[in-house]
């Protein structure tokens, strides 16, 4: 993965994490659910095992 892509994914993950934990979206369960799913996808894409798999 290119360094710039990694940085963008990390920033997006941080924003997603902060939104999930801020409590601002407590009343909107659908958005909260989608943000949690996005967080999981970003974590999977940034994990070292997925980066190794992409090099093969």
Curated annotation (Swiss-Prot):
It comes from Escherichia phage G4 (Bacteriophage G4). No function has yet been ascribed to K protein. It comes from the Viruses. Gene K overlaps genes B, A, and C. This is K protein.
